[in-house]
Amino acid sequence: MEFKKYILKKFDYNVNVSNKKFYTPDETIKQKLEINVKFLKDRKNMLLTFKIDMIDNDDINILNLKVKYILTLNNEALDISESFIKKILSKFYPIFSKFILNFYNSIGLNNIQLPEF
């Protein structure tokens, strides 16, 4: 099953501005990815929520990010299984990834890759 369109519904982030630390490229920055999928009543639209928490080696919070999309499928989903959801997410994740990497670069978090899906 393919998706027809997607709409960015919400983009919210919080950067820890009290953290004055300068990060070097050899430091490890950990990211925790959480994905929530909810099918809407018509079973053709789904709400995707991505959350990313970024912390440094000292467990200091660097960034919290929450992005919500409405994803419209070509057809109504008849069988909503874990494998079906993974298939849809694997097709959408590159779009999400490109958007977030551009955001990371715009706020100076260059060369940071997203966690694997």
State where each predicted segment sits.
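N-terminal intrinsically disordered, cationic/polar leader segments
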Residues: 1-91, 98-117
